[in-house]
Amino acid sequence: METAAPFVDATAESGIDFVHVNGATPRRYLVETMGSGVAIFDYDGDGLPDVYFVNGAAVGASAPSPGRLFRNLGGPGGRPVRFADVTERSGLARGLLGMGAAVGDVDNDGDLDLFVSGVGKDLFFRNRGNGSFEEADVGLNDPGFGASAAFVDVDRDGFLDLFAGRYVTWSPEDDVRCAPDGEHPSYCTPEVYDGESNRLYRNLGGSRFADVTREAGLWAPDGKTLGVVPLDADGDGWPDLAVANDTTRNFLFLNRSDGRSGPAFEEAGVERGFAFGPSGSPRGSMGIDVADLTGDGLDDVVVGNFSQEMSAVFRASERGQFLDDAPRLGLGLPSLMTLAFGVLAVDFDGDGDDDVALLNGHIEPEIEALQPLQTYAQLPALFRNLGGGRGLEPVAAAGVLAEPLVGRGLAAGDLDGDGDLDLVATQNGRRALVSRNQSPPHAWLGVRPIGRRSNRTGYGLEIAVVLPGRTLHRSLVSGRSYLSASEPLLTVGLGSADAVERLDVTWPSGVRQRIVRPPIGRRLVLFE
């Protein structure tokens, strides 16, 4: 192995000192081991990505610790970045037994709003546009077991709707006690719980949402969802939903909306090859991401799975079918023994090909007593894309990514403005980590979309970056990874190219734009 993108530990220098509260007790409540996520987004509109951490709590805690928001104080051009804790003055000092986060401009006012999923309640924070948030009841609160969520304009009306993942039917009173060997208490696997249907909330114009799950064809109580990512799986211009379920078949919801009669979906995971792995059985799936990993212009889907179940790369075909090709592509066997929560498919080394990161960690602190070959803290895994459809190869990491972690949430963003993607990772019951990308200087292109007919955030935007001899395809989507939200911008490494011939843009509304020889080495603000 050789080091890929040279990540260094920037946690101490960043000033980020978040430690996740999991509320763990000898009782081993299921919720203790599942959280939590992280969101990277520019909350105050100063052009610098900030970081919000979702926090957990002890079951029944009367005053749960709030999540924490860290403001980016600058450090552009690759210099060290410092953050300051602004939780109290931001209006986000509200505690819950939190799980995941999603960000998006739901009212198209130019400011990114925040949704936080939790167990027993969800929270929505409206961005006031002055560096602060207000908690708002907009119809997004559900008493279930919240998981990953994604803002996505499913009906293409220009307003972001919300797909809220739901895990299992659970309460403290119904928590099951497990001891696989009859001696050591352990966290139960989800097979002992009933599933819970996900929710689709339709945006009614920026100030209210309505639950349209059933009428949209998304009611599926047999799912046990932990991850979700939007994508256009069948190339019809409408956003579909790939859903990672834990020990039940994965879902692929194809969008059958017509723009007139409301959202409509058809579940097609089995017939499209996305429901199961090569054995034909469901797996314990957690994190999920989408990217063109083979260079054919089609979105492939990466799914992180439980230990002793290889993580998956569902390779897309032009016919809209998927095939888990992880073993042939090089991600299968290296991921067999680890338990992958956070999953990202992004270009770490700036060569133009999306690579893969798996943030690993077991759910059971004493797993070694039950399975001697397993460990609670596990090494993250980085895979470099060899390009040209040749697959992925595992590479040695550096910094905190070379240490065993109890990994959960993983998000990417250009924290220091130098044109490559840095990583922020959460651990269950442990400190969060900031990994700064110190790749050698390379050409890059950034895109910050501002929708007009489309949703203002630009979720669903697709771009083709045309270079001499190759074309790079990227899409901007919410969801991704596990319980987390990456910076809602596009950062594209250009490899050895020193210029872009043209940038072809397709907006969610269907509007197309072409920019000839766009400037590189900077972020373009792109208006629809």
Predicted regions and their residues:
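Hydrophobic beta-strand segments that make up the repeating blades of beta-propeller
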Residues: 48-55, 109-118, 162-166, 239-245, ...
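Gly/Ser/Thr/Pro-enriched helix-cap/hinge segments flanking short amphipathic alpha-helices
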Residues: 3-6, 13-14, 24, 28, ...
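Asp-box/WD-like beta-propeller blade repeats and closely related beta-sheet repeat scaffolds
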Residues: 86-103, 117-154, 164-191, 195-197, ...
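Repeat-based blade/solenoid architectures
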Residues: 16-37, 63, 90-102, 139-150, ...
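Short, conserved, GDST-rich strand-edge loop motifs in beta-rich repeat architectures
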Residues: 54-64, 166-193, 358-375
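Blade-edge beta-strand/turn elements of extracellular beta-propeller
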Residues: 7-9, 80-91, 132-140, 207-219, ...
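Beta-propeller blade termini
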Residues: 35-45, 71-72, 97-108, 112, ...
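Beta-propeller blade signature
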Residues: 68-72, 196-203, 254, 315, ...
